[in-house]
């Protein structure tokens, strides 16, 4: 989903499910969190159904598909099980993410350049469901070019190294890497999203980057929601992004 005038906020609700799975209870319900997030201004809801099912479960995805008023961004590993599930659910957006060490780059994104044929086949198969397929990659020209070559219309740039940077120099270097990656991706004709490790104290610099379509944020929202409530946590983040991206 793109919007010409403003940056979008995708709310990842995985860690609401993490809290539920810690005790194997029926609460807290990630579906309720998703609906609250939408009410508070989320432009979409992101869920990652992992092979180990450590947080989100199939049932969550099925229910969310039926009740969301915005759209679902379904994160998944490149496996036959997940491909078949995505074909059944048919989410609006699918983001392919690395789940095994072989699929990872050194920074942590999907190594598209190292497995182009496999990723191309997955992108083509998933595109037939009508989904917009994106690839979660590092802000690296080689990976961005490979993403275009395999036919993905969108990418999500991994902001984890920026989030983990310790010194002002490191922060500036990692931010420049993202800025350059966004410009390169847009120049390649791709929709460029970003996310991973973003929180209330580091999001503004990324939200100020021209060319980013959407930021996906989860853990920081769930953590802040413990103290202010989920709607307030989402609304606060949305306000930061809107102000910074003007």
From Swiss-Prot:
It is found in: Cytoplasm. It catalyses: 3-amino-2-oxopropyl phosphate + 1-deoxy-D-xylulose 5-phosphate = pyridoxine 5'-phosphate + phosphate + 2 H2O + H(+). The keyword Glycoprotein does not apply. Its main location: cytoplasm. Keywords: Cytoplasm, Pyridoxine biosynthesis, Transferase. Coiled coil: none annotated. Pathway: Cofactor biosynthesis; pyridoxine 5'-phosphate biosynthesis; pyridoxine 5'-phosphate from D-erythrose 4-phosphate: step 5/5. PANTHER family: PYRIDOXINE 5'-PHOSPHATE SYNTHASE (PTHR30456:SF0). This is Pyridoxine 5'-phosphate synthase. It comes from Pseudomonas putida (strain GB-1).
